């Protein structure tokens, strides 16, 4: 077999019949598969051992040679080579066809490649191939020209002969008529009898005349056709063709079926055709030029690659190895077989029948029919259903052809090459493991034993518990007591990977250190649930075992949960305490009035704890405590020195809470709810090492659970209190509503106005009742505590239970103007319930659809961005994008802009940023902008910073580390090899499910405001489609005039530069943003709506189009409260704008209207200019992500994405080479991917443990240092150096 690491390119091309024969190990002559009695393959059949190899290892068919010692011998009796049976997965055969057939991909695809090459319409091509018309394949021009006059004479003579014969026979008939009439007269017949005879005779003479005329016309037609006959003419009239063949057979050749195409391709002069087409393109116009351009692409491809066009017509069909189309026996003695075997059998049967007919010399019509059937059989083998009705198997199911084997989710690419099932894995239900450390997971003993079986067996032999591996295996299978001790030893320090499907982002797979547990469920640390999006209502997770030392090192250093605290989409922590933990910590840090021991003072926290234990104070009593070893809160810390004692007005609960935080963290002296906790964790992640953060998180988790239990928070129906004055509030609003209704009935307001007013009235009513309810709650009310702390639920939900349900929407998304006045505590009336469920069900249906749509969007995003990898440190560009970090208030102070978090944070500054007043440089070019730096810049009054961006990066392939900036997942500058494209796609796709589907309507009538929102809007932007409710934008600066007529409305712009007036038709219903006589600038929107990104690109240029797309996508995500960093969206937008359409090709090798990569375009131009030639001109193209993925340089990647057959057809004709730069291509052929540790520069290096690596194991005591060479995985656990973990021990 080939070693994948020893080739750099994979090329695809057209296989000729000779290629097919050289691949083959023999010809399949019979349609038989296996003998039904012996169950052994039939000789020369589809499973023949002589062709494909033995079915049993080292054993020939007849049994003469058995055993490995005969390796390589070919048995003289049965002709089978003695070898391994797995060669039946790789040896091919072939079928020699009795007549050539065309390859359906090349003639039936759109556009038809054969049609383009030969300049034939696909309809005509089909007529020829399926024996409905003859095609002239050769004309002897010289002989025809030479003999034309003599032939004309011959034809003239024949015409005269026909005319003479006609005249003769008419004369004869006329004479006979005279004789008949004379005889009748003599007999004295009546006049009408004579008339009858005369009429009959005249009829006969007319027939004679007509028949003769037809023969003469046919002769003229034959002659005229022959005179103008040229190669590739089609003749659908068989009689005409036969006559012509009879008369002038030696001057031309004509054929039917694939033979005609084959002959035509053999004589086809590619060079001459290319010249001709180039000439047409240079001088032609309109349709001719367009068609010539399209044809040139195909013809030129054959010229450049040296592919033989004859490859599109096959004389032999390859037969794929039998183990790839197996036949297996079922329980009942019946057989299940792959569809391909049926399709191959049809081809072989028809082929053999055709051979027999040809040997018998059957009539042409029968042979042609058989040839047509053979063509159809081969078509359905290659691509069933592409032409005509598909061949069906039992139960009318279309058979799966070779093309179907590659296509779609179940095809070869996506099912077996991009996603394989792996060994050393298991799955089970998950349960919570609150006693675990952040980097641990609980693994059921049985599962662990099965996963670590080989390790345990080896260790048993090493420790002399077993003599050999076999007895060790027996011990493991019988689960002897010693086995469990050995297992315990083997799994120490050996991380496992846990994965929860769907894996929407990279945090869906993380590494943990396994702890053996009883039972059958995997235990998960509560804090990592949000990363996996897991809950414990029956979710399952898969466990995978990294085997080699390298894999373990990667799992421990890169994937351990303690090293994945930050979310890659916005760089904020993802391991946040939730639910119970928040309630516990909130209960702990809250203070209440009227508690026992209020106002007491204590000399130390220990003393306060003693008082608490004796019941003298509660956790929430307001007391004063003296601390000696803390950092005071920031507001007190101005004149504080290290080690100085501080006395604080606080509570015992807060003192306990602060013990969970690092010793040098400023004392937290306020109530900690979800928001405050988020800020604290965020701060920890920014300022402390991974070890300290993990330790603090674990402490927060333990404290949270502990006090949540002690707090006794419960939910009872009595905690839900409806405000007493609800009825009074509602009666006031009822009166208002009745008034509006009355006005409507009198005709004072329209239906639409009434709706809007009612909606306003009832919204106000809901708000007021809600406020009354909130005021009614006691702070110690458990339900109020849950909402207030942010642990679970929100006020809106409580409002529905305790106040009133309010207004609801119907399935169309319109608000129903009748409110639901009851709440769930009181219960709804039947009508109210009906109204409420109506819209709610739509919501559920929406969610199901949204999941699928969102997954498909992620797939397209990954595909378009997969080859964006950090390839170098710095591309050296000085360009960048300005990003807002501050907003100036009216009083002149600058505050942080709301989007600074996702715009400038974690980027690299492109220029030096100076203080606006003092001129001192605050940030140097190339410096990282973190929270602290941004804070400094804002306090200095800087509003905007120019930052490096992937949109302005000059790297040849991928992008550079400086332009990307900080990796949001680690908080440091991104590493070379990081697959930032995939991370971007995941960050955008993962929250996709949260985006709503619907278009929101305000009123019943659809208006221009119904702009698409949510997921469909994101898809619309990334696919670069023209948006719904598109608004035109002005192409020039000038004055506006508005013209109104009955049916239409036009906006006219008179440009300032005096060029011609531009007009924009706009619909009467759209709302204008400009008025008559206004002066507008280039790119200004004319109506309410969204501009088309293509217009923005055309009018305002690339940079503005990029900004427009990024801002619009962000607008959708922000509206749903999802935070994604701009840089992720920028990566996708960059991929959408990577290509350029060539307008004038100049002296380059590019063709006009070609789509080329920006880098290639610039390189080609540089080359031409350096040689003194004329460069090409082009314009940037905005491609949707699907199109951009299919337009990738890599054919493997494109084929595994969508439209597999089309991509492969095209790639084969162009002889495409895949240089294996992206990720998918390398996964498909089984190489290491060129990203992360798979980069060239990271291979063959030694591993030295760093702080980062040790950080993972803050629970592990010291270890001996252990070096190993990279590349020869020992399978031993990766040990770490001695490391002092302070007091944080297991």
Curated annotation (Swiss-Prot):
Enzyme Commission numbers on file: 2.7.7.6
Cofactor(s) the protein needs: Mg(2+); Zn(2+)
Protein residues bound to Zn(2+) 1: 60, 62, 75, 78
GO biological process, one term: DNA-templated transcription
GO CC, any one term: DNA-directed RNA polymerase complex
Reaction catalyzed: RNA(n) + a ribonucleoside 5'-triphosphate = RNA(n+1) + diphosphate
Residues bound to Zn(2+) 2: 875, 953, 960, 963
GO function term, MF aspect, one: magnesium ion binding
Keyword Repeat: no
Quaternary structure (record): The RNAP catalytic core consists of 2 alpha, 1 beta, 1 beta' and 1 omega subunit. When a sigma factor is associated with the core the holoenzyme is formed, which can initiate transcription.
Role according to the record: DNA-dependent RNA polymerase catalyzes the transcription of DNA into RNA using the four ribonucleoside triphosphates as substrates.
Classification via PANTHER family: DNA-DIRECTED RNA POLYMERASE, DNA-DIRECTED RNA POLYMERASE SUBUNIT BETA
Cited NCBIfam families: PRK14906.1 (NF011498), rpoC_TIGR (TIGR02386)
Protein's name in the database: DNA-directed RNA polymerase subunit beta'
């Amino acid at each position: 077999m080939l070693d994948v690491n020893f080739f750099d390119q994979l090329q695809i091309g057209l296989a000729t019949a000779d290629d097919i024969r050289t691949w083959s190990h023999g010809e399949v002559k019979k349609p038989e598969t296996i003998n039904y009695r012996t169950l052994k393959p039939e000789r020369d059949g589809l499973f023949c051992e002589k062709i494909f190899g033995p079915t049993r290892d080292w054993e020939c068919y007849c049994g003469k040679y058995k055993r490995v010692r005969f390796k390589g011998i070919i048995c003289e009796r049965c002709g089978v080579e003695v070898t391994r049976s797995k060669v039946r997965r790789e040896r091919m055969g072939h079928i020699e066809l009795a007549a050539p057939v065309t390859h359906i991909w090349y003639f039936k695809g759109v556009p038809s490649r054969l049609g383009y090459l030969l300049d034939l319409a696909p309809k005509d091509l089909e007529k020829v191939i399926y024996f409905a018309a003859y095609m002239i394949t050769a004309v002897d021009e010289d002989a025809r020209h030479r003999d034309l006059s003599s032939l004309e004479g011959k034809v003239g003579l024949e015409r005269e002969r026909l005319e003479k014969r006609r005249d003769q026979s008419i004369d004869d008939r006329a004479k006979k008529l005279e004789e008949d009439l004379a005889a009748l007269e003599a007999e004295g017949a009546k006049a009408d009898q004579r008339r009858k005879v005369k009429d009959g005779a005249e009829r006969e003479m007319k027939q004679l005349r007509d028949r003769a005329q037809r023969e003469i016309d046919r002769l003229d037609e034959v002659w005229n056709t022959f005179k103008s006959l040229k190669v590739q003419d089609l003749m659908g009239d068989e009689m005409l063709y036969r006559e012509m063949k009879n008369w002038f057979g030696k001057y031309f050749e004509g054929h039917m079926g694939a033979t005609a195409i084959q002959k035509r391709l053999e004589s086809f002069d590619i060079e001459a055709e290319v010249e001709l087409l180039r000439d047409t393109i240079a001088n032609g116009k309109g349709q001719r030029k367009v068609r010539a351009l399209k044809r040139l692409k195909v013809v030129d491809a054959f010229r450049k690659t040296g592919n033989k066009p004859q490859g599109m017509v096959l004389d032999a069909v390859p037969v794929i190895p039998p183990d790839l189309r197996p036949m297996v026996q079922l329980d009942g003695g019946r057989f299940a077989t792959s569809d391909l075997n049926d399709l191959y059998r049809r081809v072989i049967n028809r082929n053999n029948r055709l051979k027999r007919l040809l040997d018998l010399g059957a009539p042409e019509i029968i042979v042609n029919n058989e040839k047509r059937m053979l063509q159809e059989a081969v078509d359905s083998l290659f691509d069933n259903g592409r032409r005509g009705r598909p061949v069906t198997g039992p139960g009318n199911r279309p058979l799966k052809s070779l093309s179907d084997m590659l296509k779609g989710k179940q095809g070869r690419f996506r099912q077996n090459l991009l996603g394989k099932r792996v060994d050393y894995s298991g799955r089970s239900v998950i349960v919570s493991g609150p006693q675990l450390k952040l980097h641990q997971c609980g693994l059921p003993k049985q599962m662990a034993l099965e996963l670590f079986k080989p390790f345990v067996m080896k260790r048993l032999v090493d420790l002399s518990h077993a003599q050999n591996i076999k007895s060790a295996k027996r011990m493991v299978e019988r689960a002897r007591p010693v086995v469990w001790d050995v297992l315990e030893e083997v799994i120490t320090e050996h991380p496992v990977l846990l994965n929860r499907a769907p894996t929407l982002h990279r945090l869906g797979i993380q590494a943990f250190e396994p702890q053996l547990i009883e039972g059958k469920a995997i235990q998960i640390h509560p804090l990592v649930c949000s990363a996996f999006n897991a809950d414990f209502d029956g979710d399952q997770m898969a466990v995978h075992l990294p085997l080699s030392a390298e894999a373990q090192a990667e799992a421990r250093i890169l994937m351990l949960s303690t090293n994945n605290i930050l979310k890659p989409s916005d760089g904020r922590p993802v391991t946040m305490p939730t639910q119970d933990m928040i309630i516990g910590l909130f209960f702990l840090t809250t203070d209440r009035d009227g508690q026992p021991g209020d106002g007491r003072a204590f000399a130390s926290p220990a003393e306060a704890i003693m008082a608490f234990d004796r019941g003298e104070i509660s956790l929430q009593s307001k007391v004063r405590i003296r601390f000696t070893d803390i950092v005071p809160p920031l507001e007190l810390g101005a004149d504080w020195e290290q080690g100085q004692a501080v006395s604080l007005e606080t509570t015992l609960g807060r003192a306990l809470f602060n013990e969970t935080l690092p010793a040098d963290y400023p004392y937290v002296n306020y109530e900690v709810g979800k928001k405050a906790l988020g800020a604290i964790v965020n701060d920890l992640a920014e300022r402390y090492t991974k070890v300290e953060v993990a330790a603090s998180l674990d402490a927060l988790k333990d404290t949270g659970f502990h006090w949540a239990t002690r707090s006794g928070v419960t939910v009872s129906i009595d905690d839900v209190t409806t405000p007493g004055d609800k009825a009074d509030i509602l009666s006031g609003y009822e009166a208002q509503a009745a008034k509006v209704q009355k006005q409507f009935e009198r005709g004072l307001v329209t239906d639409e106005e009434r709706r809007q007013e009612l909606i306003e009235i009832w919204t106000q009513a809901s708000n007021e009742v809600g406020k009354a309810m909130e005021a009614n709650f006691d702070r110690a009310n458990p339900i109020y505590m849950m909402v207030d702390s942010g642990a679970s639920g929100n006020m809106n939900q409580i409002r529905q239970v305790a106040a009133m349900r309010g207004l609801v929407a119907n399935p169309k998304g319109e608000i129903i103007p009748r409110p639901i006045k009851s709440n769930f505590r009181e219960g709804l009336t039947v009508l109210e319930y009906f109204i409420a469920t109506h819209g709610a069900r739509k919501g559920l249906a929406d969610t199901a659809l949204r999941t699928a749509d969102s997954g498909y969007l992620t797939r397209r995003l990954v595909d378009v961005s997969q080859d964006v990898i950090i390839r170098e440190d710095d591309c050296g560009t000085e360009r960048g994008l300005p990003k807002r970090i501050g907003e100036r208030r009216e009083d002149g102070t600058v505050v942080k802009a709301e989007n600074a978090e996702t715009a400038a944070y974690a980027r690299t500054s492109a220029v030096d940023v100076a203080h606006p007043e003092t001129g001192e440089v605050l940030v140097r070019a190339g410096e990282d902008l973190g929270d602290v730096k941004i804070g400094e810049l804002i306090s200095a009054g800087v509003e905007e910073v120019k930052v490096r961006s992937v949109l302005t990066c000059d790297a040849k392939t991928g992008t550079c580390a400086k332009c990307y900036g900080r990796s949001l997942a680690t908080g440091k500058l991104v590493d070379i090899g990081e697959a930032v494209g995939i991370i971007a796609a995941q960050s955008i796709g993962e929250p996709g499910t949260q985006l709503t589907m619907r278009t929101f309507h305000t009123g019943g009538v659809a208006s221009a405001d119904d702009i698409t929102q949510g997921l469909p809007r994101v898809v619309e932007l990334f696919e670069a489609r023209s948006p719904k409710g598109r608004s035109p934008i002005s192409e020039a600066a000038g004055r506006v005039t508005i013209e109104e007529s009955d049916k239409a409305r036009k906006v006219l712009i008179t440009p300032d530069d005096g060029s011609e007036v531009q007009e924009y038709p706009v619909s009467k219903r759209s709302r204008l943003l400009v008025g008559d006589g206004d002066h507008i600038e280039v790119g200004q929107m004319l109506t309410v709506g969204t501009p088309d990104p293509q217009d923005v690109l055309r009018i305002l240029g690339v940079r503005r189009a990029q900004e427009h797309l990024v801002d619009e996508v962000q607008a959708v995500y922000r509206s749903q409260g999802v935070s994604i960093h701009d840089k992720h969206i920028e990566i996708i937008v960059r991929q959408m704008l990577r290509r350029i359409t060539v307008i004038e090709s100049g002296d380059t090798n590019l063709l006009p209207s070609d789509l080329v990569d920006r880098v290639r375009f610039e390189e080609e131009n540089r080359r031409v200019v350096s040689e003194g030639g004329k460069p090409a001109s082009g314009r940037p193209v905005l491609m949707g992500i699907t199109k951009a993925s299919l337009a990738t340089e890599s054919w493997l990647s494109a084929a595994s994405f969508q439209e597999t057959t089309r991509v492969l057809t095209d790639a084969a004709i162009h002889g495409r080479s895949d240089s294996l730069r992206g990720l998918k291509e390398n996964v498909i052929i089984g190489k290491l991917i060129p990203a992360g540790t798979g980069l060239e520069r990271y291979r063959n290096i030694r591993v030295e443990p760093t702080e980062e690596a040790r950080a993972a194991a803050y629970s592990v005591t010291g270890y001996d240092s252990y070096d190993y060479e990279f590349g020869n995985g020992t399978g031993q656990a990766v040990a770490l150096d001695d490391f002092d973990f302070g007091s944080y021990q297991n």
